[in-house]
């Protein structure tokens, strides 16, 4: 195996050929599909009388359009029911494993892949979804792909891609109380910009990253795309291996763990690996970060003032003015006290069990503010069941939260869970674009799960560090 970064090693390991276009044809170890981006690709196969080449390397779920209040069939939304039925037919005819709502394993695609043990270090993973970068937390190269590429992978298990540069982002020190992985990635995007990663893959490293659990690493890799990067990853280590041991695949195939671990160790970036760029951030100086605008890069520390547009680079001034007008915020003020109408705990960024535990620690013994509708949407049916086994559902329900079924929910306006009018939401999701949560007048403030919980019970953006937290639920 070649020397260098994990990206170099895994790329070379999966190279089938170098194409005349300058792209590389890569073998894909795992192809994840869902109901939104796969139908057209299956249609293209049928037009050409082609079959799925490796159904055993393909796994399907339904997440974007599935309702979270009532998943009984047929769905109330005719379009959602049609997409679900088409996916069911496609996977049945192709012999593809499908985690459907009756399986007990359904959930957001980037939650179920890791929890089932399908996601493994040194893999190449693709999915017709921009947040496929989530799987990079395990030391995989994971890329979101378009419909024509989905077709190619279904037919050949390969994809044509251009190799990118690698930027190492070192987050040093120890994160302080109330500061989570979500704050780290929001700060990275704030500093480097939403286009700062264009042409790059991000390697996350440093003590603060190494100290994170796997769920925290997934949150960071998940939002690499919001920073403009093609993908993001963390080198696998003992934290990775211990987490993998508990997954379905390795519980059923324990011998494979010992067989694969030498490969996992070999693909770690070498200590003397050369990077195209290195950025260092002192994690000990970070505080909870929230967004004030309409892109994930328009963020600010909870105690810091919202920037004046004229103080920003010229190319960012007009978008900042428009964002501040839409959000109704004032330069020079902080986001503390910004009133919210909705609190949303969910999405492929922050809907895993540790996220829910931390939020429950804030919620326990408190009540959702009268002016707020609050919901918890677990990332998968397994997360939901595990949370219920710990009594987390009762903590949330007693506080006034709605406890929903698994799905993408209010992360995007593609299902029944949406903002209404100019409602403002405190959201643990990954995007705050205008209209993202269903209403063109809606306002989304991104933050970590604890901060969402704090906003839910106070009715406004609140520094969670000021609330006494119940750490044992």
Swiss-Prot record:
Organism: Haloferax volcanii (strain ATCC 29605 / DSM 3757 / JCM 8879 / NBRC 14742 / NCIMB 2012 / VKM B-1768 / DS2) (Halobacterium volcanii)
Keywords annotated in UniProt: 4Fe-4S, Amino-acid biosynthesis, Branched-chain amino acid biosynthesis, Iron, Iron-sulfur, Leucine biosynthesis, Lyase, Metal-binding
Top-level taxon: Archaea
Record's protein name: 3-isopropylmalate dehydratase large subunit
Annotated catalysed reactions: (2R,3S)-3-isopropylmalate = (2S)-2-isopropylmalate
InterPro entries registered for this protein in UniProt: 3-IsopropMal_deHydase_lsu, Acnase/IPM_dHydase_lsu_aba_1/3, Acoase/IPM_deHydtase_lsu_aba, Aconitase_4Fe-4S_BS, Aconitase_4Fe-4S_dom, IPM_dehydratase_rel_enz, IPMI_cat
Record bears the keyword rRNA-binding: no
NCBIfam families per record: leuC (TIGR00170), PRK05478.1 (NF004016), PRK12466.1 (NF009116)
One GO term of the biological process aspect: L-leucine biosynthetic process
Region described as Disordered: 421-440
The UniProt record lists the keyword Nucleotide-binding: no
Transmembrane segments: none
GO molecular function: 3-isopropylmalate dehydratase activity; 4 iron, 4 sulfur cluster binding; metal ion binding
Pathway assignment: Amino-acid biosynthesis; L-leucine biosynthesis; L-leucine from 3-methyl-2-oxobutanoate: step 2/4
Subunit structure: Heterodimer of LeuC and LeuD.
UniProt-listed Enzyme Commission number(s): 4.2.1.33
Cofactor: [4Fe-4S] cluster
Chain positions recorded as [4Fe-4S] cluster binding sites: 348, 408, 411
Cofactor remark from the record: Binds 1 [4Fe-4S] cluster per subunit.
Family recorded in the similarity comment: Belongs to the aconitase/IPM isomerase family. LeuC type 1 subfamily.
Functional description taken from the UniProt entry: Catalyzes the isomerization between 2-isopropylmalate and 3-isopropylmalate, via the formation of 2-isopropylmaleate.
